[in-house]
From Swiss-Prot:
GO cellular component: NADH dehydrogenase complex; plasma membrane
Enzyme class: translocase
Enzyme Commission designation: 7.1.1.-
Protein name: NADH-quinone oxidoreductase subunit K
Subcellular location, principal: membrane
Function: NDH-1 shuttles electrons from NADH, via FMN and iron-sulfur (Fe-S) centers, to quinones in the respiratory chain. The immediate electron acceptor for the enzyme in this species is believed to be ubiquinone. Couples the redox reaction to proton translocation (for every two electrons transferred, four hydrogen ions are translocated across the cytoplasmic membrane), and thus conserves the redox energy in a proton gradient.
InterPro entries: NADH_UbQ_OxRdtase_chain4L/K, NUOK/Mnh_C1-like
Subunit structure: NDH-1 is composed of 14 different subunits. Subunits NuoA, H, J, K, L, M, N constitute the membrane sector of the complex.
Source organism of the structure: Campylobacter fetus subsp. fetus (strain 82-40)
Gene: nuoK
Length: 102
């Protein structure tokens, strides 16, 4: 049964990786990163359940707290970027790109 949870977590993680690599919408990329964090939490919870140790569950709670803080900060940043650029496409965020290549 634990193999099923590990398999689900790996599938979720790789769906998140594909979302980060293939998508151009900054909100979709943000949600893919959150999916990867949840997959990591599921792996820790699975191994904590297998070893009957509470350390993994503490790490899961820490991951959930970090994900909540990241979600609030990330969504606020996304809203500000949308207000400034009127788009969530990552191709238009190129202010740091070196334009003068000599």
């Amino acid at each position: 049964m634990l193999d099923f949870y590990i398999l689900v977590a790996l599938i979720l993680f790789f769906i998140g990786v594909l979302g980060v690599i293939l998508r151009k919408n900054i909100f979709t990329i943000f949600m893919s990163v959150e999916l990867m964090l949840n997959a990591t939490a599921l792996i820790f919870a699975t191994f904590a359940r297998q070893s009957l140790n509470l350390d993994g569950q503490v790490i899961v709670m820490l991951i959930i707290a970090i994900a909540a803080a990241e979600a609030s900060f990330g969504l606020a940043l996304i809203v500000l970027l949308y207000k400034k650029k009127q788009s969530l496409n990552i191709d238009i965020f190129d202010e740091l790109k070196d334009r003068d290549v000599s």
